[in-house]
Amino acid sequence: MDFGKRISIEAVEEGNEFMPKFDDRGLIPVITMEESSNLVLMHGYLNKEALKLSIETKQAHYWSRSREQLWKKGETSGLYQNIKEILVDDDQDCVIFKVEVEGSGASCHVGYKSCFYRSVENFKDLEFVEEEKLFDPEGVYAGQENPTKL
């Protein structure tokens, strides 16, 4: 599978061909949303291989910047993200995956449904908007390095 060649602004903005624009590291950001509710589940990155695999298999694959490797969401946890729709923005430098999540429906490695489980109150303090974890990350990811970096 090859993506379209970016030959004109008009073709990128108004055309019918998918011509994703990857950054200088070969990545494009992706926002992943629950199809049924439009809840934002996570933000990640795709390289060409991850995007191609996601399209071909209809299961979300991502590029991990912290581990510098391709990963299929749900491979360890069983919480696979089945892609129902892919949207692209006007200049094709960001995509949205609308997904249905298997199992408990969680997408966050911390155990919550959404990685956006806290809101910023008063522009400085964090308040939990999700209070209940849908799975125990210690049980699911035992022995694996936490992907969060300081």
Where are these regions (language model features)?
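C-terminal binding/interaction regions
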Residues: 2-27, 34-41, 46-150
